[in-house]
Swiss-Prot record:
Extent of motif Nuclear localization signal and RNA-binding (RRE): 80-104
Entry's Gene Ontology BP terms: mRNA transport
Motif (Nuclear export signal) on chain: 109-122
Keywords assigned by UniProt, alphabetized: Coiled coil, Host cytoplasm, Host nucleus, mRNA transport, Phosphoprotein, RNA-binding, Transport
Main location per the UniProt record: host cell
Gene: rev
Protein name stated in the entry: Protein Rev
Record's subcellular location: Host nucleus, Host nucleolus; Host cytoplasm
MF terms (GO), sorted A to Z: RNA binding
Source superkingdom: Viruses
GO CC, alphabetical: host cell cytoplasm; host cell nucleolus
Function noted in UniProt: Escorts unspliced or incompletely spliced viral pre-mRNAs (late transcripts) out of the nucleus of infected cells. These pre-mRNAs carry a recognition sequence called Rev responsive element (RRE) located in the env gene, that is not present in fully spliced viral mRNAs (early transcripts). This function is essential since most viral proteins are translated from unspliced or partially spliced pre-mRNAs which cannot exit the nucleus by the pathway used by fully processed cellular mRNAs.
Length: 213
């Protein structure tokens, strides 16, 4: 039995080689394309012919493989790129650019640190100002609101602004009301302490009355 099996192997190999040669000749003569030859090989159930049947000129993998001659079909492979060889001066130029960028970054950081130190000094000067706004030790240029009440400066500013009362009726804060459509003073609103949601939008009363409805 073993001998019979061994005898059958060469015959099968011969059949396979004959089929392969016939298909290869048909491809070489142009009677069949490589794809048709592969399909016939698969239909005849002779195994995968990818590594045995040579592709025709129309289905070549690359020009380089055509120049080298016959090679089995192994699919499309990207060509290997040669390693990039840089000129020696390239690395020196690159180091110079990197060092220059680092130097610029250090200069920017030093400028920012100096600016922060200057702002800290000014903040310390502002903190030295007492609640009355008088401090002989503080420099003359440092004019700022007191640290105890940050709204004192805005209150003093609005208190100096001129108020014009154009109406006789009193509004809900006990002050003479303005004519319809006139703006409300910011100082009146801050000193009143009344509901913030009830203030008209844009600081103005609706036309037709001194007080909001």
């Amino acid at each position: 039995m073993m001998e019979e099996g061994r005898k059958e192997e060469p015959e099968e190999r011969g059949e396979k080689s004959t089929m392969r040669d016939l298909l290869q000749r048909a491809v070489d003569k142009g009677h069949l394309t490589a794809r048709e030859a592969l399909d016939r090989w698969t239909l005849e159930d002779h195994g995968p012919p990818v590594h045995h049947v040579k592709l025709g000129r129309s289905n070549t993998v690359s020009i380089a493989e055509c120049a080298r001659g016959y090679r089995p079909c192994r699919g499309r492979r990207p060509a290997r790129r040669p390693p990039i060889r840089r000129h020696p001066s390239f690395w020196g130029t690159l180091r110079g650019l990197v060092s220059e960028a680092q130097r610029r970054q250090e200069d920017r950081m030093s400028d920012l640190e100096n600016r922060m130190a200057e702002l800290e000094e000014r903040f310390e000067d502002l903190a030295l100002v007492d609640s009355g706004g008088k401090n002989p030790a503080a420099p003359a240029q440092s004019v700022s609101p007191p640290s105890s009440n940050p709204f004192a400066y805005s209150l003093s500013h609005f208190s100096k602004s001129k108020r014009v009362d154009c109406g006789e009726k009193g509004n809900r804060w006990g002050r003479p009301g303005a004519f319809p459509g006139a703006g409300i003073s910011e100082l009146d609103w801050i000193e009143s302490g009344d509901g913030g949601d009830e203030r008209p939008k844009g600081g103005r009363y609706p036309r037709g009355g001194n007080t909001p409805s």
